[in-house]
Amino acid sequence: MARLAGVDLPRNKRMEVALTYIYGIGPTSAKQLLEKTEISPDLRTDALTDDQVAKLRDAIEAEYTVEGDLRRQVQADIRRKIEIGSYQGLRHRRGLPVRGQRTKTNARTRKGPKKTIAGKKK
C-alpha cells in the first residue's frame, strides 16, 4: 500500500482515482501529476515501484498544498473573513450559506434541523 502525503492509498484502484483520496487533489490535479511524473493513469496502486512513489511524493510536495496544511489554510481564511467583518465572514458566523444561495426554503444542511415556531391559533 502506497503512502503519500500521510494518506494510505487504496491498493486496487487505478492511480488516477487513488490520488483523489488525498485532500486537495481532485481528478484534474491527479491527471496532471501523473503526466508530469510519467506514470500511467491505468496503473494500479499496488503495482507502483518505490521509485514511482518517490517521484509522486516529490511532485506533490513541490506543487500542491494538501491534507493538514490545506485544512489549516482554509480555516485560517474563514477566521480572517470573520475577523475583518466581511459579508462572507458574517454568514460563516451565523451558520448560513455563504455564496448567495436562497434561505427562505432549503439551506437545511447549513441551518440544521427546523426549529418549530408556535403557529397562529384558530
Swiss-Prot record:
Transmembrane segments: none annotated. One of its GO terms (biological process) is translation. Residues 93-122 are annotated as: Disordered. SUPFAM superfamilies: S13-like H2TH domain. Pfam families: Ribosomal_S13. It comes from the Bacteria. Keywords: Ribonucleoprotein, Ribosomal protein, RNA-binding, rRNA-binding, tRNA-binding. One of its GO terms (molecular function) is structural constituent of ribosome. GO terms for cellular component: cytosol; small ribosomal subunit. PROSITE patterns: RIBOSOMAL_S13_1, RIBOSOMAL_S13_2. PANTHER family: 30S RIBOSOMAL PROTEIN S13/40S RIBOSOMAL PROTEIN S18 (PTHR10871), SMALL RIBOSOMAL SUBUNIT PROTEIN US13M (PTHR10871:SF1). Part of the 30S ribosomal subunit. Forms a loose heterodimer with protein S19. Forms two bridges to the 50S subunit in the 70S ribosome. Belongs to the universal ribosomal protein uS13 family. This is Small ribosomal subunit protein uS13. The lineage of its organism: Bacteria, Bacillati, Actinomycetota, Actinomycetes, Mycobacteriales. The gene is rpsM.
